[in-house]
UniProtKB/Swiss-Prot annotation:
The keyword RNA-binding does not apply. Its main location: membrane. One of its GO terms (biological process) is transmembrane transport. It comes from Shigella boydii serotype 4 (strain Sb227). One of its GO terms (cellular component) is plasma membrane. It is a multi-pass membrane protein. Residues 30-102, 156-168, 250-277 are periplasmic. Gene3D superfamilies: MetI-like. The gene is gsiC. The complex is composed of two ATP-binding proteins (GsiA), two transmembrane proteins (GsiC and GsiD) and a solute-binding protein (GsiB). It is found in: Cell inner membrane. Keywords: Cell inner membrane, Cell membrane, Membrane, Transmembrane, Transmembrane helix, Transport. Part of the ABC transporter complex GsiABCD involved in glutathione import. Probably responsible for the translocation of the substrate across the membrane. This is Glutathione transport system permease protein GsiC.
Length: 306
């Protein structure tokens, strides 16, 4: 197992290098001139050229790439073109709000999604199954931005129960986490149901029932563990999606997180911030997939990596 983890970690190096090259090329292909955006609409050509020199955009592209890669290897992603603060500080100040929003959304989505999936599988083709899957399909189909605006209109504007924007208190997490986790809970419910339906028909489940084990214990002890492998895979993918893909929700709720920072950086063509954020998202996905693979062995001892 240790050798497998080490090999996967070493595999990060070429993957992140390829991502770095692609991201660098992508941001420099974006339309628009960062120097013109930063200088302002009334700046003349001389001022814009001065800003370009200050940002290093007047240098050849290969020189900019070498400067970017050599500094990134040392953990230095440069200064933000807009705020002139270190990129690491910009990301660090936005990381925790996104992380807590992701964890909050994931916790309720996993609990609700797995419960709905188990209920649907146990009472297959009956009204609990149909009700759970109808709710799940609705959760997948309803766009996140529309759900967020609906929740704000009902619970903030009409009823006045919850705040609309910001991340200052636990109350701010309620509507935003519900919006962000709705699709995840729906996907989790469908995956859990599909996995449980297959497990419930296995021989060891019938053997446990024949021995007089209660149905609840059969489902929770024998069924849940064996049905968890595909569910854990989906949990890992969805966690990575939430951590890096909460852009729409953060924009709707004016959330001070990484998603909103990325949108603002793209609008202002802030190359260093865009490059660092996408590298961070790539690293998150790779590490989450590694954790999921390691969890396989903990859930099912028959799985071993040699």
């Amino acid at each position: 197992m240790l050798n497998y983890v080490i090999k996967r970690l070493l595999g990060l190096i070429p993957t992140l290098f390829i991502v770095s090259v692609l991201v660098f090329l992508f941001v420099h292909m974006l339309p628009g001139d960062p120097a013109r955006l930063i200088a302002g609409p009334e700046a003349d050509a001389q001022v814009i050229e001065l800003v370009r020199q200050q940002l290093g955009l007047d240098q050849p592209l290969y020189h900019q790439f070498w400067h970017y890669i050599s500094n990134a290897v040392q953990g230095d992603f440069g200064l933000s073109m807009v705020s002139r603060r270190p990129v690491a500080d910009e990301i660090a100040s936005r990381f925790m709000p996104t992380l807590w929003l992701t964890i909050t959304s994931m916790v309720w989505a996993v609990i609700f999604g797995m419960a709905a999936g188990i209920i649907a599988a146990v009472w297959r083709n009956r009204w609990p199954d149909r009700l759970s899957m109808t709710i799940a399909v609705s959760g997948i189909s309803f766009p996140a931005f529309a759900l967020g605006m609906l929740l704000i209109q009902v619970f903030s504007v009409e009823l006045g129960w919850l705040p609309t924007v910001g991340a200052d208190s636990w109350q701010h997490y309620i509507l935003s986490s519900l919006t962000l986790g709705a699709a995840v809970a729906a996907v989790m419910a469908r995956f859990t149901r599909a996995s449980f339906v297959d497990v419930l028909s296995e021989d060891y489940m019938r053997t446990a029932r024949a021995k007089g084990v209660s149905e609840t214990w059969v489902v929770l002890k024998h069924g849940l563990r064996n049905a968890m492998i595909p569910v854990v895979t989906m949990m890992g993918l969805q966690f990575g999606f939430l951590l890096g893909g909460s852009i729409v929700v953060e924009k709707v709720f004016n959330w001070p997180g990484l998603g909103r920072l990325l949108v603002d950086s793209v609008e202002m063509r802030d190359y260093p911030v865009i490059q660092a954020e996408i590298l961070l998202f790539s690293l998150e996905f790779i590490l989450i997939n590694l954790v999921v693979d390691v969890l396989y062995a903990a859930i099912n001892p028959a799985i071993r990596y040699k």
